[in-house]
Amino acid sequence: MPTAAAPIISSVQKLVLYETRARYFLVGSNNAETKYRVLKIDRTEPKDLVIIDDRHVYTQQEVRELLGRLDLGNRTKMGQKGSSGLFRAVSAFGVVGFVRFLEGYYIVLITKRRKMADIGGHAIYKVEDTNMIYIPNDSVRVTHPDEARYLRIFQNVDLSSNFYFSYSYDLSHSLQYNLTVLRMPLEMLKSEMTQNRQESFDIFEDEGLITQGGSGVFGICSEPYMKYVWNGELLDIIKSTVHRDWLLYIIHGFCGQSKLLIYGRPVYVTLIARRSSKFAGTRFLKRGANCEGDVANEVETEQILCDASVMSFTAGSYSSYVQVRGSVPLYWSQDISTMMPKPPITLDQADPFAHVAALHFDQMFQRFGSPIIILNLVKEREKRKHERILSEELVAAVTYLNQFLPPEHTIVYIPWDMAKYTKSKLCNVLDRLNVIAESVVKKTGFFVNRPDSYCSILRPDEKWNELGGCVIPTGRLQTGILRTNCVDCLDRTNTAQFMVGKCALAYQLYSLGLIDKPNLQFDTDAVRLFEELYEDHGDTLSLQYGGSQLVHRVKTYRKIAPWTQHSKDIMQTLSRYYSNAFSDADRQDSINLFLGVFHPTEGKPHLWELPTDFYLHHKNTMRLLPTRRSYTYWWTPEVIKHLPLPYDEVICAVNLKKLIVKKFHKYEEEIDIHNEFFRPYELSSFDDTFCLAMTSSARDFMPKTVGIDPSPFTVRKPDETGKSVLGNKSNREEAVLQRKTAASAPPPPSEEAVSSSSEDDSGTDREEEGSVSQRSTPVKMTDAGDSAKVTENVVQPMKELYGINLSDGLSEEDFSIYSRFVQLGQSQHKQDKNSQQPCSRCSDGVIKLTPISAFSQDNIYEVQPPRVDRKSTEIFQAHIQASQGIMQPLGKEDSSMYREYIRNRYL
C-alpha cells in the first residue's frame, strides 16, 4: 500500500558567502533558486561565534533587495566607484562546520562536489574540494604562535578523499531504516507532527500548515545516527541556533554504483561503507575497543539493489543487505616502538566479565537486532602465539555473555582459520566461504520492500523457503547482522564480505524476479561487476586504515591471479609498512583534532606534547563512572524485549521523538523528488548524465563479439570477457587502468560552486572542466610507418564485431534499397532552390504517405471508432438480443446442420 510520506529535501543546496568588514552573510538557496535563507555571522568577536538565523524564507527578489541594501549601507563613501561595501567571498554547496583552535573560529565550506550514486532519485555526492575561511576581522584578531600548527594538523584530514553527503537521503542509516520510517502509519505521523508543533512552535516553520487540510503529504526527516557522522562535532555549536536545512551531515568511507543491464532493464548495484567516527584512527595506533564499546576500524557495509526503471521509493523495487567489520572487542594493542613487520599482540587490561564486549554487542542488538553472527578469521594454530591470543579471549567473552541471553537470541560464533585453508592445495577457500555465506544469509535474511513475486509462489525454491529474517506484508526485513573480523579487518575480511555479499546478491536478484534461482556463478558479468565494486571498496578502506591498498584480493584466494600480482602484493606490503611506521602518528593527531577528541585549550598541553592519546579515547580512566552496568543483565531491557527486530526501527515513543514530521502540499519542492532529480529549470547535457556515465555491465564487461548471449548471468570463458577484446595489449592496459581509477569516482564532471550573479563566467569554467570526458581513452600519436598496422587493427575487429566491413562494396540489392530511400526523402522535401518556401509546381509531385492500416491516427484524448460492415453489425445486434431472450429464426443451413447432428448422434 503506498504511503503518504516522503523524505524532506533540504532547501539549502547552493551557498554564496558575502563579506563586509563587520559581518559575513551566508546566503543559501535550493537548486531552483526560488527559496532563500540567510545567516549573519559576526566578525567583530575575536574568539566567540555569534551567528544569527532569522529563519525567514526569502524570494529571489527579496534577497536581491537585501543584498542591495547591505551593499549600500557598507560603502565607505557615497557614490565612490569600485568601493562596494559587500564583497562576494566564495560560492559553495554546503557547510561542513565551524572549528576553533586557539584564536577565532573558522568556517569550512564545500566548494566542489561530484555525484557518486543515485538511490530512488536521491543524489549522493562526494566532497571534491573545500575552503576554510577565518571569520574574525584582522583588526580584532588575537594571534597565537601555535595556531598555524593546529591549522596544518586539521587540514591533514583530506576532506576531498571519500567524504560523502546527500541533501535528501540519510546516509548514516540503512535503506531498511529509511524506508521503514516512510511506511509508518499515518495516524502516528499526525500525532507526532502535532506533538512537534506543541513542543517547539515556530511561526516561520509552521506557517500555512493549518490550511492544508487532509490532502497533503507528510515530509519526514530523521535524526542521523551520529556514530557514522564525521562532522558532528563541527556542527554541534550551531545545531540549536540555525534551521535544520543548514546542517549537512557527512559520512566517511566508500560509495560506488554500477549498472547491471538485464536485457535492457537497468538495475543499479550500490555499495556504501560507513566508517565509525568513534575510536577512529590508523592501523597500529587503534586496536581493540575503548571503554564505551566502540571498536577500531568499524565499518558498516551496505549493498543496495534497485530497479532503476521506477524512481519512487513507494512504487519502485529496492533491496539491501548490511554487514559489519570491526576489530576484536577487547582491550588489546600492538607495540610499534620496535621495527617489526608484525608487532606482538598484548592484552592491555583483564576483562573477566567481558564488560567492553557487552557494551559493543548491546549496541549491535539495538541497531541490527538478532542474531549477531561473528565470523572470526584469525589464525587458531601457530607455533608462537600471536593471533591465537585474540581467538581465545573472544571465545571466552562470547561464552560468558551467552549465559545470560535467551537461547533464541544468543551470539553465534563461527571460527575459521582462513590463512590455513589458503596455504592448503587441496582446499578451496571460496567454496568453504560460500557454505558459510549461505548459512549466514539464511539466518539474517535481507531487506526488500515488495512481497514475494507470483512466479516464486508458483515455482518455490527450497533455499528461498528456508530464508530467515522477518516477513511482513510489504516485503522482508533483515534481522541480525554478520560481524567479520581478522587482525586488521582488511584483506581476509574483504574477501569474506565479498562472498557473503555475492550470496545475498543472488537472493536480492531472485526477490526482484530477475533470476529464476537464488544462485550466481563466478565468471559472469554480474559477479565481475560486483567483484570490482568490492575491490574498490576494500582498497579505499585499506588506504584509510592501513595506509595502502589491499594486499590479497579475491583473485588471490581463487588462485587465478597472474604472476605479476605477487610483485604488486609485495609493493603494497612495503607501502603499508612505511605508512604505519612514519606517517600514522601524524594522521592519528589529525583525526583526533578533526573529530573533537582533543580540544586545544590555552594553558594545557598541546596535542603534539601528549605521549599517548589513550586517555582521550578512554574517558573512564580520568573519572569514576556514575553508574556501573550489571555483569549478568548486561543488555538494555527495551532492546531485548523487541528482538529479533532492531530496537531503532521499532515504532515507539523514543524513536518517534527522533523524527521531524511536517505536512506539505503534494507538489512542494521540499518533497518533490521528480523535480529534484530531473531539474527541468536547468539546461543539462545528455552526455554528462550520471546514468550514462556510470560503469555498466553491457559496456564494460560484456564481450563485444557477434552472437554472444547478452545475459549478465551467463558464464564467460576467460578469453570471452569484455576486457579481452579491447584490442592490443597497450590499449587493454589503458582501459583497465582507466576503469580502476574511475571505479570509486564515476565519470561525470564535478560541480564547482557558482552563483546566479555570475552565470557567464561560471559557464566557461564548467565547460573547461567537463570538455574532456573521463571515459575517453588517451589518444597516442602514431608514425607514418605504423599507419598500415593501425588500419589493419581497426578494420579487422569491425568485421568480427559487427559482421560487416565498410571497405567492401555494396551489393546491387542493398544499393537499390538505399537509392529508393534517398529518392523517397527527396520527394518529400521538394523546394525551389531560390526560395526557402516550397514551390507551387512541386507540391503536386510530393508523395503523400498514408498509413495502410484500417485504424486512424488516434491520440490519448480522442479515438475515432473503426468502420464496421453491415454483416458484422447484424451479428453483434443478434448477440445482444439473444442475451435479452429475443432469438433469431434459424436459417436453412443452420437447420440442416442441426438435423444432421441429431441423426448422427441418436439415430
UniProtKB/Swiss-Prot annotation:
Annotated GO CC locations: early endosome membrane; endosome membrane; Golgi membrane; intracellular membrane-bounded organelle; late endosome membrane; lipid droplet; recycling endosome
UniProt-annotated stretches for the region Disordered: 707-788
Effect on the protein upon substituting L175P: In YVS; complete loss of function mutation
GO MF annotations in UniProt: phosphatidylinositol-3,4,5-trisphosphate 5-phosphatase activity; phosphatidylinositol-3,5-bisphosphate 5-phosphatase activity; phosphatidylinositol-3-phosphate phosphatase activity; phosphatidylinositol-4,5-bisphosphate 5-phosphatase activity; phosphatidylinositol-4-phosphate phosphatase activity; protein serine/threonine phosphatase activity
Keyword set includes Ubl conjugation: no
Biological processes per GO annotation: locomotory behavior; myelin assembly; negative regulation of myelination; neuron development; phosphatidylinositol biosynthetic process; phosphatidylinositol dephosphorylation; pigmentation; positive regulation of neuron projection development
Domain of life: Eukaryota
Disease: Charcot-Marie-Tooth disease, demyelinating, type 4J: A recessive demyelinating form of Charcot-Marie-Tooth disease, a disorder of the peripheral nervous system, characterized by progressive weakness and atrophy, initially of the peroneal muscles and later of the distal muscles of the arms. Charcot-Marie-Tooth disease is classified in two main groups on the basis of electrophysiologic properties and histopathology: primary peripheral demyelinating neuropathies (designated CMT1 when they are dominantly inherited) and primary peripheral axonal neuropathies (CMT2). Amyotrophic lateral sclerosis 11: A neurodegenerative disorder affecting upper motor neurons in the brain and lower motor neurons in the brain stem and spinal cord, resulting in fatal paralysis. Sensory abnormalities are absent. The pathologic hallmarks of the disease include pallor of the corticospinal tract due to loss of motor neurons, presence of ubiquitin-positive inclusions within surviving motor neurons, and deposition of pathologic aggregates. The etiology of amyotrophic lateral sclerosis is likely to be multifactorial, involving both genetic and environmental factors.
Name of this chain's protein: Polyphosphoinositide phosphatase
